Every structure is written in C-alpha cells, then in structure tokens.
Amino acid sequence: MSRIGKLPIAIPSGVEVKVGTEAVEVKGPKGVLVTPTHTELNYAVEDGHVVITRATETRTARAQHGLRRTLLANCIQGVTKGFSKTLEVIGVGYKVAVKGNLVELAVGFSHPVIMEMPEGVEAKVEGQKLTISGTSKEVVGEIAARIRRVRKPEPYKGKGIKYDNEQIRRKAGKSGGK
C-alpha cells in the first residue's frame, strides 16, 4: 500500500470538497480548484477527512494512489493558504517591474521581456525579489520556472534570475598565466 496514498487528508473549516465521477472540486476562502479523479481509485469524504482507496491492485492504481492524494492535498492547501515562489534578479542593471498582470524583466537583452500572469496568479516586487503567488501549486511553479528560464543564473558571476533558496554552483575563471 502507498505510504502517502493511505494517509487521510484533513479538511479544514471553511473548505468544501465535492467528489464527482470525473473530478474532485475543492472550494475555499481563496477560490475553487478542480483536480481530476482516476477510474481505479475510490474517493470518500468521511467525518472531516478525504480518504482515497484503490478499487483494484493494478500497477497503474498503485502508481496513481500517492499522486492523486498529493494533488488533492495541494488543492486543499491552495484554497486555504495558497502557494508562493520567490525569485531573485541578480546583475548590474537587471530590473524587474510589475504593471497590472504583466511582469517586465530588463535582464541584459536589447528589449524588455514582458510576461503575462494567468488568472489567479499574483506577482509582487520588493527590490530585486519577485514573489509569484496563487492557489494552484502547479501554475505558480510553472510561471516561476518560465520567468527563471528567461535568464538562468550563470556560473561565473552568478548573474541571472534564480530561486530564492537556490545555490548556484560557481566556477573559477580562466587561470590567465603563462
């Protein structure tokens, strides 16, 4: 049995979970999230907890058990607390600005790179730090990865866009001797 999949998911107060045939809908103070169900898994809401069990013991059911439980737990956390990722822009002349739902990056190109934030995702700037926050962990992570991809941190001077907790492996430059 999946060590993660067998754990029940606690439903906090103010959160409503509806189990359908195709998807599970989670409503909370921060919004609504929907995650698809799997045909080989059974979903049940019992006394303030969501329990996911396997209908069959096939390889796909075993593989999906822990995954679907984690996805549902992420939905519940997303509609209550939300998720956020912080990016740091490092480099002389590198700037980041938020204008409405657009993030404008000036990171050494001849033009500013403008990225649009999808619905439900918010961006804030404090100095050289950009914080992406929203209800869906998947969307927040994808947007943060796309922004980082614009100018990955380089190993010699460390310039670029990096995650706040990321360690950049630095390299020594040329030795330059004869």
Swiss-Prot record:
This is Large ribosomal subunit protein uL6. Part of the 50S ribosomal subunit. It holds the Pfam family Ribosomal_L6. This protein binds to the 23S rRNA, and is important in its secondary structure. It is located near the subunit interface in the base of the L7/L12 stalk, and near the tRNA binding site of the peptidyltransferase center. One of its GO terms (molecular function) is rRNA binding. Residues 155-169 have a biased composition (Basic and acidic residues). Coiled coil: none annotated. Keywords: Ribonucleoprotein, Ribosomal protein, RNA-binding, rRNA-binding. GO terms for cellular component: cytosolic large ribosomal subunit. SUPFAM superfamilies: Ribosomal protein L6. Residues 155-178 are annotated as: Disordered. InterPro entries: Ribosomal_uL6-like, Ribosomal_uL6-like_a/b-dom_sf, Ribosomal_uL6_a/b-dom, Ribosomal_uL6_bac-type, Ribosomal_uL6_CS. The keyword Membrane does not apply. Belongs to the universal ribosomal protein uL6 family. GO terms for biological process: cytoplasmic translation. It comes from the Bacteria.
